[in-house]
A protein has these predicted regions:
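Soluble catalytic domains of enzymes that build or remodel membrane lipids, polysaccharides, and related
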Residues: 1-173
Length: 173
């Protein structure tokens, strides 16, 4: 394996739902790849009330449990938040800050142009962006490949119905 990319939602809103975090982190740290294991945050990588896959509005500010970050460090996973790494002087890997969580945490999310402007355009640019909503902007900014998650391939009800009745494939969302 050359590179492992995890496009968000490593956690399901509750750190305590991990039965044995140390054991799971040890297992993940066993992933061997030539260039490393990288991730970006997803919209479920925060402490938030959830039931049957749906979150509920909260009055308090939604925050990321600090144990998530400690877990990733223990697991040997490098988190990229609107950050870029040049890998082996051969290509760039960009990890985006999740758009929903950036709003909740009152953080700025860079534009694709801001991210790619300082990069050497002769090298390929691979982006991990949990929510695949800005593909045209990514393409216009020189992104060659966008790796996303979030859609669950339309496998969660009622998203299955949306896919059926809209005539769109899950990738089109």
């Amino acid at each position: 394996v050359d590179l492992v990319c995890i496009a968000g939602d490593l956690f399901d809103n509750d750190y305590n739902a991990i039965k044995d975090p140390d054991e799971v982190a040890d297992i993940l740290s066993g992933i061997k790849s030539r260039y490393g294991t990288y991730a970006c945050w997803g919209n479920h990588d925060v402490s938030e009330k959830i039931l049957a896959g749906f979150t509920f509005p909260q009055k308090e500010t939604i925050v990321r449990d600090g144990r998530f970050t400690e877990f990733l460090h223990h697991a040997g996973i490098t988190m990229l938040e609107d950050e870029t790494v040049c890998i082996d002087n051969a290509f760039y890997l960009v990890g985006r800050r999740d758009k929903d969580m950036a709003k909740n945490e009152q953080l700025l999310r860079k534009t694709f142009s801001e991210i790619t402007e300082p990069l050497d355009p002769s090298l390929p640019i691979i982006v991990m962006d949990h929510q695949p909503g800005e593909l045209s902007e990514a393409s216009d900014a020189g992104v060659d490949l966008d790796l996303s998650g979030h859609t669950h391939d339309g496998q969660m009800f009622p998203a299955t119905l949306w896919s059926i009745f809209s005539g769109k494939t899950p990738a089109e969302f």
